[in-house]
């Protein structure tokens, strides 16, 4: 809250409202907000069209469409892939979940939401899928902002790359999930 004279001794400085980021399965109520998520044109080669990705996830029995919310408002989307060869096309020898089409709406980028959402995503998977020990995703090798956001959320790149793809070479990143106590 601002005092009338914010330069006076003892004046209080306005503190921004806390940003509460959480993730949730897409419901019919959240779906319109997810379909409205847009990335910048230069990013569309990395994640594609969100409305298409939502429809594709909802039609795949091995997928779960997820919304990223800030203070209850949809700002992003991703897809959990439960297939045994998800993301990298081969089995990993440990129970894992793939992450696809992770995106933050371009109007909400640059605020740290991506790394906080990725951390919330990992916590959600650990809580709702306690049998899973690993998350795996692929991120375009030139997407330095995305790579840094995933690293801040605990994902690591172990040197594996995937060639090809519609946007070019991608780093394979992993996030290990500790067992619940």
Give the positions of each predicted feature.
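Conserved beta-strand-loop-alpha-helix junction that forms the acyl-donor binding cleft
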Residues: 131, 135-147, 163-168, 175-176
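Solvent-exposed beta-strand sheet faces enriched in polar/charged residues
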Residues: 81, 136-138, 158
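Active-site acidic-Proline motif in GNAT/NAT acetyltransferases
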Residues: 105-107, 111, 141-142
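Terminal substrate-recognition subdomain of acyl/acetyltransferases
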Residues: 2-16, 161-181
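Acetyl-CoA-dependent GNAT
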Residues: 16-20, 25-101, 105-107, 115-120, ...
